[in-house]
């Protein structure tokens, strides 16, 4: 009997080893076919890439109204010198009646975030090319093929799949500063036609590559579309890709006429702002919450993922272990709903406006009952005394409904998405959202003295807000920035 068991185990182990060997052989052959399909030596000797991409951008989960998806434009210009690691990453978002520019330059160990509206610059959050430009890199099937070759020892053959009415092989591969990617490789052509990866908050992200043509000796998709959980997010309109072209060193240098912005706040660890004895602003990176201890319970606002961790830090700092009774949801945008299930698991009632409830229900995995919601009609007061919180529903160009969270005892206003910046000092750059929020605040006459936000670590004064508004200028596409206007 024991001999029989040993034989069965040995047979099973042999089968597993054989299968693993077969998959390794398939993977090697598949990677070789991808390299050949994309240009062979031309791919292996890739030195630099330049991508100019224009998209239509359905504002999935980010529209002005939760009931209608608005359409914006998103234009991207990436130059990546793979030999030096230098990066030029220019982005333009044109929507909500305004232009939102972004430019980051990486030059060796230096990395700068440039404000094209004010001609000022500060340190970028990282000098890692994959952190700065990984999002655009993943839209290039050529760069995916190049990374697959580099990481073949760590890649995994997953099996066959049927995609877009054609046979494919699927491979899981690592990608720097990202969850693993799954590539769909056309079995006949060796070309990558799809890539998927998982986002812990938004679900499956899909990249679809079409219309492959030869450019500078390499095959490259001329049309790229990107979807979030099955909903279109970026729809390719035009795409120009060049490889191994001469690059000017000046492209990766600070342009003339830019002045330093100041020191960036370190948000790599949780930041704690004590606003008064019972009011705290706590967060990390780009997700922050405000907590108010009413004396019998806690009222919170700011719904990025990590809410539980922020609440625990509040309890450590304040010594208050009262329950989170209310979690205020500012608006329907999907990035602000990532902590919804944490709030529900903590036992909180979700305070919001009626038209935000469907977005919350869609974002939650817990199917919250109607009793877990408390809807605001124009305005509402929670708590009393030093723990009094006033909520006001206002409309701006950013969102049809925005709940303002105001604490009269500390004269503190909590905002999401309308104001702020990453720097410790100086005047934050106002945009159309800021101006629209100021117009909504004026008739409320709140008398706030401090502003904290859902995305920034700094505590702002009302003077910072006023200075930002005074420095605001309408911003249109500059003549010397064709990626914006075309």
Regions found by a protein language model. Name each.
Residues 22-23, 27-120, 154-162, 305-306:
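N-terminal mature ectodomain segment of secretory-pathway/periplasmic proteins
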Residues 22-29, 105-180, 187-189, 199-200, ...:
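Flexible, processing/modification-adjacent segments and terminal tails
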Residues 438-486:
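Divalent-metal (often Zn2+) His-rich catalytic cores of metallo-beta-lactamase-fold enzymes
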Residues 235-295:
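Zn-dependent metallo-beta-lactamase
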Residues 307-351, 445-447:
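Active-site metal-binding motif and surrounding structural segment of the metallo-beta-lactamase
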Residues 7-15:
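Bacterial N-terminal signal peptides
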